[in-house]
């Protein structure tokens, strides 16, 4: 196990990471064991839950005063979403699925007893679309729009359309990440015309605070995977009928337990590291 936790360069090797074959060979070279097979190495690694052959990307959030301020404002909205809704103010999260590929595949072989579903690997591309999703936090309901282009002009055009659909509201607290279309001057100019929109930004590299990311996963797994579209128009029509069905069958407020109190405790622990 100690060998697997060391970098290969420590043993004079220029490979970037260990495989079970490499570890077996090096263990014998170092005299740790007289003989050992890669299979036995894999069993040992499995027992201690060590996976030197795997990696995962991550990005450290910058824990500064701006992070804390933005997180507090977002979490306050989540904690008060129902109370605000009763007063005529919605908390709405927004996010995009950019450049979603429109892929046409051969007919799927549906699952039968003893055989899982099979999907043809080859496909024909029919371009991409940009999908904008709105999540109404206190109900879990969603709305969806297709943007012809992912930029500020198309973004605030869809914001204006959302406002027209909900003109009876007093205002919206809009949770969003720091995407360029969200932070552009044209978008801020649109917001400045009225207090109806009350934008709240997630901290840099902390878009996971936007509950719309949960919606993308919940909606996408049911309506965007394991299927095929012959054209852009066919996919758009599919989306038009899919999001109302999602609201009818699956929508519910997402469970969110991270409060401002918990965030401040977490911040105090990690900001000092």
Question: PLM features: what roles do these ranges have?
Answer:
Residues 2-10, 17, 21-125, 272-273:
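Charge-mixed, compositionally biased segments that are often intrinsically disordered regulatory tracts
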Residues 111-170:
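Electropositive, glycine- and tryptophan-enriched low-complexity nucleic-acid-binding patches
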Residues 142, 212-234, 245-247:
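Active-site proximal helix-loop segment of RNase H-like, two-metal nucleases, encompassing DDE(D)
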Residues 169-183:
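Acidic/histidine-rich, metal-coordinating catalytic segments
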Residues 118-124, 193-211, 227-229:
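RNase H-like polynucleotidyl transferase catalytic core
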Residues 176-178, 200-222, 235:
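RNase H-like two-metal-ion nuclease catalytic core shared by retroviral integrases
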Residues 104, 234-273:
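C-terminal domain-tail junction helix/linker
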